Amino acid sequence: LAGGRIAEPASYHLTESITRHGIIAGRMKTGTPVRIDGRSVHYELMETQDGENDFHRFSFMSEPRKLKQLQCWTCFTNEEVHEILRKGLPDSPLFNGQIQSIGPRYCPSIETKIVTFPDKPQHQLFLEPEGETTQELYLNGFSSSLPMDIQLAALKKVPAFKDLVVYRPGYAIEYDYFDPTQLKHTLESKIIKNLFLAGQVNGTTGYEEAGGQGIIAGINADINCHGGEPFTLGRDEAYIGVLIDDLVTKGVDEPYRMFTSRAEYRILLRQDDADMRLTERAYKLGLVK
């Protein structure tokens, strides 16, 4: 079934237009949790989690901007929830063969959790506001590709969700990525000049991973246009350097996520010395004044 993100069409022929030049493509999968109406939730039956007020910055050069912290909540699934989910597994694309690609190891769907850890009587769920001006909540920990009626029936067995209203169900998709070993350390393609690839399309997963690649690709795209030496970061300079070096030298066989354990210089790559490591390099590029 072709499709993009919810309510969006699939992107047809884009991959084919790239692979015909010799760039290798593969498939991975990802999923997203259900979005729920916060007005239908019994908050008194959950534990609260307050935001952090002790902010630590990476740089002293910009004015402090305190983001308003919103409260989150936690609760747990139970055996009744798991039993409904188990009965629905034949309808899950992740388990009936419709989706066969590899997904993020550290963001398993709720179906995967109950199958992989059948001895666990409960799994934690986190309710996260989607913004200051909406009642919509992101139900972290309940990523699913099951039909909506099964998702809703299972969730209603959680005491705090007995009157739950769902805005959008969780769902899973397969997507194309391109072999990152065909990229330079600048994230420019070795095959197509001036084509830069960054983010999930390189086989990574995660916001910071995508953002880190994006800034390096953007810097080097600008350098290609206006002239200058290619900009790269070493494994001893930044986690971005570790990430990109792993991608372009080792490649990926599952969605890649950055960990401190991947960095042999992790004692040097600290939050408290980020400004000393990177400010001078950013200044020479004109990124800071």
Please tell me what each predicted stretch does:
Residues L1-I36, V158-P159, D163, I216-N224:
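Glycine-rich loop(s) and the adjacent beta-strand/alpha-helix scaffold that form part
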Residues G4-Y12, S144, G211-G212, G234-E237:
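Short, conserved loop/turn and helix-capping segments at secondary-structure boundaries
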Residues E16-L152, I240, I244, T249-K289:
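An anion/pyrophosphate-binding glycine-rich loop and adjacent beta-alpha core
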Residues M28, F95-G103, F161-P169, G228-L233:
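Flexible, glycine/charged-enriched surface loops at secondary-structure junctions
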Residues Y138-T204, T232-D245:
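A glycine-rich dinucleotide-binding beta-alpha-beta segment and adjacent secondary-structure elements
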